[in-house]
Each structure stands twice: as C-alpha cells, then as structure tokens.
Curated annotation (Swiss-Prot):
UniProt xrefs under PANTHER family: AMINOGLYCOSIDE PHOSPHOTRANSFERASE DOMAIN-CONTAINING PROTEIN-RELATED (PTHR21064), HYDROXYLYSINE KINASE (PTHR21064:SF1)
Stated role: Catalyzes the GTP-dependent phosphorylation of 5-hydroxy-L-lysine.
EC number of this enzyme: 2.7.1.81
Protein name: Hydroxylysine kinase
Family statement drawn from the similarity comment of this UniProt entry: Belongs to the aminoglycoside phosphotransferase family.
C-alpha cells in the first residue's frame, strides 16, 4: 500500500469527476436514477451525496458515491475487505454504511475514467447514506464522549474476536503512514513544519515513541483498528427532549473505513482521544471521558496505560505534520487539509509542556470520577 495516503492526492491521482460524469456512472453501474447530487469533502478520494428518484427494494433513496484515488484503487482486495468490515459491523449493531451492489452483483467496480489530460483506473463504490449530524457540529458532552470511547472499543473487540475474511491480511499495511507503529516515518516529512519550536516538539514526540513505546509493542494486544475516528467520521443524533437544559446525543453513524489496519487496542484509544480533544472546549477532560468509555469494554493493561500519553502525542504529530506537507503540494485543498491544525498545534504544545504525569493524572482521574457518578 502507498506509504502516505496523501501522496495519492498530490500526484494527480485524486479523482476529479464532474457531477455529470458521476451521474452517468451511477446510472450505468447501479441503475439508480439520480434526482440530486452534491459533492462531499474528502482528503484524497472523491465523494458525492446522491438522492435517487425512487426507493430501492430496501427502501433506500439516499447514497454516498465513493471514487477511490488511482493509487489505492490498485488494491481491490483491501477495498473489498473494508466493505466486508462494514457489512460485518452492521450485522453486529454498529451503525455503519452498507454497500449497494452493481448490476453485476459486485461491491465495487474498477472504472477507466477519461479526464481529458489523463486516463485513470479508479474504484467506484455506492454506499447507503447515514443520516445524522457530524460530531464536529455539536457540543460534545461527557456522555457522548464516553459513548464514543465505548463504541471505539466495541468495534475493535468485535473485529478481533469475530471477523473472519479470506483477505484479512490486507490490513497488514506495512509502511502505512497513519499507523502509529510508523511514527518514525514522520521525520521524512517534518521539513514541512517551518517553526523551530514546533520542529523540536515533533522530534521530541518521535524520540519518546522510539524510546518508550516501540520497544514495548509486543506487550500490547493486537487488533484491527478503524484508525480514523475523528469528529467528521462520527455522526450523532439528538436524544434529549425539547426544552432540555443540555442537549444529549447518541452515535448514529461511523464513517470512512479507508484507514483500517492491524494495530493495537491502545492505538484506537489514542487516536480517538486526540480527535475528541480537537474541537472540545475542555480538551484534557475530554480525553478522560473517552478513556472511561473505552475501558468500560476493554480495561487497559499497565503497559498500555503507560503508552497512552506518548501515542496521543504521536497522532497529533502525524496529523499536523502531514497536513503541512500536503498543503505545500496541494494548496487548493488547504481548508480541508488544515482542519486539525486550527487547534491541534495548541493542544500538542499543551501536552508537551505539561508532561506525561500531569496529563495522565487528569485523564485517569476524570475517567474514574465519571464512572463513579454514572
């Protein structure tokens, strides 16, 4: 698999279908008559919201069309395995999207697409549309953060214990830049960060990973990670009654399984904490609520607890460094690429300055307090 998922978007491999091209593909591959189409954001692929003129046999009339970049489209077995995970999770009560099959009964179709200046082979999938509000648009309460931590743990646990697939080894993705095992690869891209102080923090994070985490990887419990539970990939719906003092939500959808890879339970927790900190008004305590939810399903071992602080810093560093690098090569996508950077550098600097002991104290005491009062 490509080492850096952004590189595909930066080497003219990112899909760029017009809406007319997308409509033609949908109608020819799936027999879906399109009533409305609109683009959806994507890092290195292309997504469209589709509304059809009539319901399918399952009562569905809303879809998401996903066109995968030409680099990742070379790995059809991985894309098919990701789709199988979605089907598996749906059957086990997780609100994930379901694939819509082509007229030929396939879950994806590799299409040769003519862009005029170039011809590319890109995988096309149609998935059911999940209604809901992205978590990024609501104020995350302790309750929803707990539920998200619990959901993250449940997903990994289900996949580790019960997911069977002939191409499961596809999730061993080697040098995949977004796997926390590959934190050291960030040095190749750190030159994109120009500020000396920030460069030093990134190098400190990588060195701490290599010193305190890497030697202990074999102590962690292995699983398949979703790997990208950010606040745009989690949908929620309101559960509170009109007039309630505080709005309450429940998780109504989990999106985007393209970063799945073999990792460890503690990786999923660190990734989820990092993303839940990004938009929070109380980022340090937010980590504690996620931790409480995760541990309600998968209690951490001492070795895993000891690595958590370092791994959260690693994920901040991955996201921030790769965003800077990607913007240099793809400036027209800056607004989307830099979502994390708006508050991410501040949060990473805070964690770095406070240090492991002080941050862990807040996380674990917050988790214990939440459990004791709920």
């Amino acid at each position: 698999m490509a080492e850096n998922k952004h590189i595909a978007a930066l080497n003219n491999n990112k899909p760029a279908l017009s809406e007319d091209q997308a409509v033609q593909l949908i109608e020819s591959l799936y027999g879906v008559k399109v009533l409305n189409i609109k683009p959806l954001p994507s890092y290195d692929d292309q997504n469209f919201y589709i509304k059809s003129c009539s319901e399918d046999p399952n009562g569905c009339c809303e879809y998401v069309m996903k066109i995968t970049n030409s680099e990742d489209s070379r790995y059809g077995e991985l894309l098919e395995a990701q789709t199988s995970v979605m089907v598996f999770l749906c059957s086990n009560g997780v609100p994930a999207q379901k694939p819509v099959f082509t007229k030929n009964g396939q879950s994806l179709s590799l299409e040769t697409i003519d862009y005029g200046s170039t011809i590319q082979k890109q995988a096309v999938r149609l998935l059911t549309y999940l209604p809901g509000t992205p978590l990024a648009r609501v104020v995350a309460t302790p309750e929803i953060l707990f539920d998200i931590g619990k959901m993250a743990a449940n997903i990994d646990k289900m996949l580790a214990e019960n997911f069977l697939h002939p191409n499961k080894t596809c999730f061993e993705r080697g040098q995949f830049i977004w796997n926390l095992s590959n934190t050291s690869l960030l040095r190749k891209y750190a030159h994109a960060v120009k500020e000396t102080e920030l460069q030093k923090i990134i190098e400190d994070v990588i060195t701490q990973y290599e010193t305190f985490v890497l030697p202990n990887l074999n102590c962690f419990r292995k699983c398949i990670n979703h790997g990208d539970l950010n606040d745009h990939n989690i949908l929620v719906e309101k559960t509170s009654s009109p007039g309630s003092i505080q709005e309450q939500y429940k998780v109504s959808g989990i999106l985007d399984f393209s970063d799945m890879s073999f990792g460890y339970y503690i990786f999923e927790l660190a990734i989820t904490i990092m993303y839940m900190m990004i938009e929070s008004n109380d980022p340090l305590h937010a980590g504690g609520y996620v931790l409480a939810g995760f541990q309600s399903v998968i209690p951490l071992t001492d070795e895993e607890k000891d690595a958590l602080f370092f791994l959260v810093n690693c994920r901040f560093s991955q996201s921030l460094v790769m965003a800077r690098y990607s913007v240099q090569l793809c400036p027209e996508n800056e607004e989307y690429l830099m979502i994390t950077a708006k508050t991410g550098w501040k949060h990473l600097q805070t964690l770095h300055d406070m240090g492991k002991e002080a941050v862990e104290k807040i996380w674990f005491e917050t988790a214990d307090s939440y459990v004791a009062t709920h």
